[in-house]
């Protein structure tokens, strides 16, 4: 099974690093595309077996799974250049981009997944939320298997994606804010570190 990741920024790079450490998809079957070669050079220095390219169409040519790891406002632009085949599975990690929006670019028959991972995926510690459209039970299980290897994964309906995204993506920030407030309260009460 070959995977193409479009975008080598924070999340795309983190997913590539996580996949390279896993056992389900060999690192040599992962191709990462990004127009900026600096991100690709850094990624390949860490994981030389990962394939890299600056050309999105080249990256997806033989891919079974195409992961879009670009900013939401770039989705239409990227999908206008890459032309998915019906056998390819599209995975979008762009927050707030719905299936309805993705279908406008790829057509109603395409198998699509929406994923919300977090950057802990590079350390195999992500909590990844998954929604599917036009996917078989086997495809859903494959996504769960892949992303459970990179932390924990849970299949949810798309209608719950926005609310659960706030918890999984921002949850750690809420915890750290509480710790910071507790520390400040301690200082104000005369307890110094």
Regions found by a protein language model. Give the residues of each.
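Internal alpha-helical scaffold of NAD(P)-dependent oxidoreductase catalytic cores
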Residues: 101-111, 127-164, 174-193
């Amino acid at each position: 099974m070959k995977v193409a990741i479009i975008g080598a920024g924070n999340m795309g790079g983190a997913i590539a690093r996580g996949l390279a450490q896993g056992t389900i998809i060999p690192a040599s079957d992962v191709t990462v595309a990004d127009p900026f070669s600096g991100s690709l050079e850094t990624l390949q220095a860490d994981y030389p077996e990962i394939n890299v390219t600056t050309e999105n169409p080249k990256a997806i040519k033989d891919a079974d799974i195409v992961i879009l790891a670009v900013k939401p406002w770039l989705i239409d632009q990227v999908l206008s250049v890459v032309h998915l085949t019906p056998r390819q599975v599209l995975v979008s990690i762009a927050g707030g981009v719905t299936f309805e929006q993705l279908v406008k670019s790829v057509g109603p028959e395409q198998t699509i997944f929406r994923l919300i991972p977090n950057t802990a995926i590079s350390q195999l510690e992500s909590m990844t939320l998954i929604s599917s459209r036009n996917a078989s039970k086997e495809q859903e299980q494959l996504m769960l298997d892949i992303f459970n290897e990179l932390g924990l994964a849970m299949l949810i309906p798309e209608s719950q994606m926005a609310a659960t995204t706030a918890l999984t993506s921002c949850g750690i920030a809420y915890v750290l804010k509480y710790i910071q407030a507790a520390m400040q309260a301690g200082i104000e009460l005369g307890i110094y570190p």
